[in-house]
Every structure is written in C-alpha cells, then in structure tokens.
Amino acid sequence: MGVGIKLFQLLIRQKLTGKGLKGKQVTPQIVSYAVTKACNLRCLHCHADARDAFPNELTLREATQAIDEMAFLGTEALIFSGGEPLLRKEFVLKLADYCIDVGIIPAMLTNGVLINHKVAYELKEAGIMAVGIPIDSPEAKLHDRLRNVQEPLTKR
C-alpha cells in the first residue's frame, strides 16, 4: 500500500474519531456562520451568487442551540458573515449578545454599506469585538466597479 493511501486512511480515521493527527480532540476554534445568503450588492467576484435569502435560514432558537454546542466544544470566536449579515441585523445583534453570555467572541464580516454611526454603536453595544470590511482595490473606482456599487466609496 502506498504512502499516499496510508496517509489518506489515517486522515479519514482521525476525522471520524474527531481527533487531530496527534490524537488530540479537535475543537473548532473559530467558526464562520453565514446568517443569510441575501446581499445588497452584486459583486462581480462573489462565489456565492448571494442574491436571495436561504429558504430555510436558522431561527433564533436554532442558532442559539448551535452556539451552545460551539461553546460546549470550546469555540473561541464566531464570525457572522453572509451574503450580508446586516440584512438580518436584529438577529445578529441578539446572537452577538448571546455569544458574550456563553463566552464566545462575536465578530462580523460585512461589505460595510449598511454601517453608519447608529449601526456601529448597536454592534458595539451587542458585543461585536471586530468588524471586517473587505476593500477590493486601493483605487475607489475599481473597488466600486468590482462591488457593483453606484455610490463612490469615498462618499460613504
């Protein structure tokens, strides 16, 4: 049996037992949760074709149960993403607050279009520890073209 086959079998066996290569229990330290597939932009490069919401997005109860399981497993941080997570802002704010209660650091990845002073304050108050906003080019015109936005980046 070749080395490649043996390695593959080892990886499968470790995956099925939930242990890493050194036999230690695997913990999902950082989890990214796409709270919706819906998006307010139509980026040229989007792999998700994020236009409409998932037909069966998690309810608040289902999401908090999943967060409980993450906390039990030792997850340290949960990144809310999408689509655009701020299209479900109230949902994200409640989940962020819940994350704090169970000891998970909440963060968010957003296109930033929906953030203003009020939203930034709400995110801070809910306990969101970090917000990632991708910038696709140092040139505002190219960034806006890639993101398919009408309002220039410099005016936001």
Predicted regions and their residues:
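N-terminal pre-core extensions flanking Radical SAM catalytic domains
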Residues: M1-A50, D68-A71
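Radical SAM/AdoMet-radical enzyme domain recognition
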Residues: E57-F80, R88-R156
